[in-house]
Amino acid sequence: MASEYLEHKLALLPGLPGCYLMKNINSQIIYVGKAKNLKNRVRSYFKSSHTGKTAQLVSEIVDFETIITSTDKEAFLLEITLIQKHQPYFNIKLKRGTGYPYIKITNERDPQLLLVSDIRKDGAYYFGPYPNVYAAEETMHFLQKVYPLRRCPGHQGRPCLYYHMGQCLGACFKEVPEAEYDQQIRKIKSFLNGNVGHAKKDLTQRMEKAAADMAYERAGDLRDQIRYIEATVEKQKIISNDSTPRDIFNFYLDKGWLSIQVFFIRQARLMKREKRLFPVVNSAEEELASFIVQFYQRKNTVLPREILVPASIDHDVIEELLKVPVRTPQRGTKRDLLEMAGKNAKLVLEEKFRLLELDEGKTTGAMKEITDALGIAPGHKIEAFDHSHIQGADLVSAMVVFVDGQPNKKLYRKYKLQTVDHADETASTLEVIRRRYGRLLKEHAPMPDLILMDGGDIQMNAVKEVLEDEFDLHIPVAGMVKNDHHKTADLLFGPDDHHVHLDPKSQGFYLVQRIQDEVHRFAISFHRQVHTKHSLSSRLDRIPGVGPKTRNKLLRKFGSTKKISEASMAEIRELGISEAVARTIHVTLAAETAEIKNPRTPTSL
């Protein structure tokens, strides 16, 4: 059964081909699919009965997003790109990182391939942006195997491990001719610009030769590299055979709001997109021209070889400022892509307008219901607190902020408790309230209109003690009460901590429920991070030869003991760790993992 919010969105779906992205309660994309008719396909998830994995997927969907395309074929190709980009749980279980990194070929005598997020004017060659770290790493590792440059610090007097693996040209122990580097770099650039035919042909010839020489392991590696090209490059093209890196901008204007869509075309495929919505003062054309120029003035943004815009945009001004050709395609695939960006801009804006009324009830309207029920002045900002610990260990507190009924995650705060060493609601509350509002007073920052505590009268009285007696602040404080089923029930408020009832079907009740769930989630999540870090540190500290510096290196690189135990000796030694210590780490963690998987049965007396 779809929620009221989803029912509104389902009613807005177009009967066009495209892709849909299902999201869970944390706004994570958990599934990407395609459809000839988005309206029929997406509605089928919520209007039909399901079993197994589909039923599990539907139970986790709280929101969705769509991208319309011109044809079903485009939808199919775009689906592949989106799955590769987002790594959704219900498509592929592998998830590795976020962000938009670039592959860099350094400008050195012995150049190397690197993954970077900072773009500098250092004469290096940058290719990207990639949709995520996973996609960039896969591409870079492929290039390091097929077209190696330097993969070691260099000049160490002996061949490095990567040289023996065929992934380094040998700057570690000899002088590599510049011509050899130049040849490799030309091949790398050609591949990154979408010209993969030569690489595939070369790999096929090498695979056949290795098989003929009965070097079957090497032939298998080469076969996997060919499959990488087929799976992640060739199948991800979106119609065009033109590999020119280009960005496409289009817009839709209505009721004083401008919707902008940006498509990033790299290696002849839609690498990623950005969408923006904001109210405008000038004409849409002027606003878009200004937006484009500012867009490329941001840090770590590489200019494409070509920018496509609608005909109404002033090409000359943008070209002059950015020194990049700006064109309006008249026919063919490029015109289709420009129109696709415009259609998506329109769809996003129309959806916003139709959801505004519903959103208003859930945000500012819900906030007013709460303040009216408490009998306090109307306000905008709520701050809520919760504590978390395990048997009095690793005590933490967390605060979430909701403004006009919406979470503002930039204002969230985490607190490691410093004066409390055991489970004590009063002491924990006193410390976190002193730290939070003492800081706001010192910085002359605005105070919230309401404070909510995920607890009863003990926490509320502690808050009032600090605010009123120590800081002379008079901020309304209420406690969020749960019923026997651990669900939001009422609010506690006033000098006598009386129960304030909220209609369970009201938006105000839903907002309190959201705040209570969110602050609990945030506190639990932070506690797990702290507890896991302490647990990891203690496990590593017990290994002979591992001191604080080595421990921190390992945690920064791998993040968990599981990943450390799965790492090769070479990967551990890359951190500057000696072979003996690396071997001890590897053996110790492997033994611990084996003990967890196959615990010994106690012997009977």
From Swiss-Prot:
Signal peptide: none
Residue ranges occupied by any UVR domain in the UniProt entry: 197-232
Keywords carried by this UniProt record: Cytoplasm, DNA damage, DNA excision, DNA repair, Excision nuclease, SOS response
GO biological process, one term: SOS response
GIY-YIG domain sequence ranges: 15-92
Main location as per UniProt: cytoplasm
InterPro entries per record: GIY-YIG_endonuc, GIY-YIG_endonuc_sf, GIY-YIG_UvrC_Cho, RuvA_2-like, UVR_dom, UVR_dom_sf, UvrABC_protein_C, UvrC
GO MF annotation, one: DNA binding
One GO cellular component, as annotated: excinuclease repair complex
Subcellular location: Cytoplasm
PANTHER family: UVRABC SYSTEM PROTEIN C (PTHR30562:SF1), UVRC/OXIDOREDUCTASE (PTHR30562)
Family: Belongs to the UvrC family.
Subunit structure: Interacts with UvrB in an incision complex.
Function: The UvrABC repair system catalyzes the recognition and processing of DNA lesions. UvrC both incises the 5' and 3' sides of the lesion. The N-terminal half is responsible for the 3' incision and the C-terminal half is responsible for the 5' incision.
Protein name per its UniProtKB record: UvrABC system protein C
Gene designation per UniProt: uvrC
